[in-house]
């Protein structure tokens, strides 16, 4: 018994010391949390009773060069529910199903979800939003928002693009200039009680949104409209698969029009054209059909340019001194290269002709001869110098690149076919940009649509054009000689259907058979520019798989002629010329 007393005392001391240690530790922890971590936990406590709401910024508009609005904003509503504020869930569900056209299952799932705020539907028209707001049902929130609206529906749809449900750019310029157009969202911080109900006495903290900037582009809505109407007309008349018309300024690369028919409805971009059985498609098939509908063949697709490429062959040959205008050629209707007979469009041949006449006649044997004179290395280096082997750098996403033989794979047959525009592929925008650079005095241009952006109040204007080096790719003398030859093509040669009364027009026709050969499918095109001695505008018309007559000089040249007849008087810089006035060489 005597032995147990010291043991109990020791036990009590140990327990006492342990209690002191535990209490000291707890005290230290409390001091640490209350003093050193006070700010952190105050912030957490504040977060528990704060609700953050975003304020949408108004998206910048897209306007043509003259200030015509092509993409605008339409005020709409976003309908949401706040779970903790709902007193009559069934009434809320019934109202939202009725007004928004949603299924009960969809609405109930969102209404019964425990969250601070749950979006039910966006892009609701103002009238419907007002009707919902006036019911006064607790827990329903109606916020003003914006959705994209395109006043001209399908005008330049493949250039402008569209936005998604969150108003973010998806395609074309809407996507490329997202950073300029989108602006910055604002913010509202509200104090709430434990149930998430806003405390009106506490007020709110607010950061105003910054609206997006307006984007001005080089398109001229009037020229675009006329080009698009012409493309639709010829597409219908020739029962063609599609028609593209490009109009640009060869001096600086500004695109005045880019039509690629059929265009699509910008305000309803997910609906396929009539005639396509959408209801019978799988999701994958429908997406593929939509992607095809949205594609811009001027930029996204390549093709064999055919005889229009002879402009580039001529420029390279003249610049390298392998041909002169007066050089004589013989055309029996074909030319043999390494045992392969390459035919001319004129089966009986053109007989004796000089280089200018060979270009006017679009004679394949003449251009094969010239190409072989240059040789593969010289021709390839010329194409490289002209910028033909790179992308143009146009400010629209998805530009395709040139598909060309590797330099060491170009033999005599390949060189022969390249010289008249076959066995390789380029984009229409590349052809238009390269020819523009060759006829403008020899300076490479970058085709573009963006001009500048500015705040909606006009207080700040910023150029969006990418600075590019003004690279000389051809001498001014060769450029002038080339323009003179192409003027003769329209005045007295195969391009005479592109002639415009009162103006001097230069140009080149083209007719190319699509791959695989022998299917009877052709691409007809005509490239024209005016005035011939000092070009201010260039147009390229491409008709894919026209039915009936398919020669470029007969079906595409008249389209450019009609285009020029209507837009040349409209362009201030173009001067009228007397019918018999000759082109001036510079």
Describe the role of every protein-language-model region.
Residues 1-277, 302, 324, 377-389, ...:
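Periplasmic/cell-envelope proteins involved in peptidoglycan metabolism and beta-lactam response
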Residues 71, 193-204, 250-308, 312-545, ...:
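Beta-lactam-recognizing serine transpeptidase/beta-lactamase-like catalytic domain environment
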């Amino acid at each position: 018994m005597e032995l147990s007393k010291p043991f109990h005392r020791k036990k009590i001391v140990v327990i006492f010391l342990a209690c002191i240690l535990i209490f000291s530790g707890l005290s230290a922890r409390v001091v640490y949390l209350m003093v050193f971590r006070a700010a952190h936990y105050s912030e957490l406590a504040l977060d528990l009773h704060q609700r953050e709401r975003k304020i949408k910024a108004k998206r910048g508009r897209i306007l043509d060069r003259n200030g015509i609005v092509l993409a605008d904003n339409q005020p709409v509503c976003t309908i949401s529910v706040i779970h903790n504020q709902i007193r009559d869930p069934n009434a809320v569900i019934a109202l939202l199903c009725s007004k928004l056209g949603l299924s009960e299952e969809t609405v109930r799932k969102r209404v019964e979800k425990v969250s601070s705020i749950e979006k039910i539907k966006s892009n609701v028209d103002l009238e419907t939003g007002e009707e919902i707001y006036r019911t006064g049902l607790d827990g329903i929130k109606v916020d003003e928002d914006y959705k994209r609206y395109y006043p001209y529906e399908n005008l330049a749809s493949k250039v402008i693009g569209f936005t998604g449900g969150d108003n973010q750019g998806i395609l074309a310029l809407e996507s490329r200039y997202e950073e300029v157009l989108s602006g910055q969202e604002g913010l509202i911080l509200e104090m709430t009680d434990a149930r998430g109900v806003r405390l009106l006495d506490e007020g709110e903290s607010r950061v105003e949104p910054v609206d997006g900037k307006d984007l001005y582009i080089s398109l001229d809505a009037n020229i675009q409209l006329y080009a698009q109407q012409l493309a639709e007309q010829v597409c219908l008349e020739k029962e063609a698969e599609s028609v593209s018309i490009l109009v640009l300024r060869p001096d600086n690369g500004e695109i005045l029009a880019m039509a690629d028919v059929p265009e699509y409805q910008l305000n309803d971009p997910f609906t396929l054209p009539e005639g396509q059985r959408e209801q019978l498609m799988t999701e994958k098939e429908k997406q593929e059909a939509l992607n095809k509908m949205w594609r811009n063949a001027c930029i996204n697709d390549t093709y064999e340019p055919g005889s229009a490429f002879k402009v580039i062959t001529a420029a390279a040959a003249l610049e390298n001194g392998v041909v002169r205008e007066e050089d004589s050629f013989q055309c029996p209707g074909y030319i043999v290269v390494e045992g392969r007979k390459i035919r001319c469009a004129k089966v009986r041949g053109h007989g004796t002709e000089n280089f200018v006449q060979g270009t006017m006649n679009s004679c394949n044997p003449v251009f094969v001869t010239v190409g072989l004179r240059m040789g593969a290395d010289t021709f390839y280096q010329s194409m490289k110098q002209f910028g033909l082997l790179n992308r143009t750098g146009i400010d629209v996403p998805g530009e395709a690149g040139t598909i060309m033989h590797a330099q060491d794979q170009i033999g005599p047959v390949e060189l022969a076919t390249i010289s008249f525009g076959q066995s390789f592929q380029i984009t229409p925008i590349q052809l238009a940009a390269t020819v523009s650079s060759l006829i403008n005095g020899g300076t490479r241009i970058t085709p573009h649509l963006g001009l500048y952006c500015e705040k909606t109040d006009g207080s700040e204007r910023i150029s969006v054009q990418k600075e590019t080096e003004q690279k000389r790719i051809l001498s001014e003398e060769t450029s002038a000689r080339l323009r003179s030859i192409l003027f003769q093509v329209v005045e007295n040669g195969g391009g005479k259907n592109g002639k415009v009364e009162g103006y001097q027009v230069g140009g080149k026709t083209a007719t190319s058979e699509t791959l695989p050969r022998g299917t009877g499918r052709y691409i007809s095109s005509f490239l024209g520019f005016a005035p011939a001695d000092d070009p201010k505008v260039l147009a390229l018309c491409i008709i894919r798989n026209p039915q009936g007559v398919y020669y470029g000089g007969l079906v595409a040249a008249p389209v450019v002629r009609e285009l020029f007849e209507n837009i040349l008087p409209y362009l201030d810089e173009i001067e009228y010329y007397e019918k018999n006035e000759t082109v001036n060489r510079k």
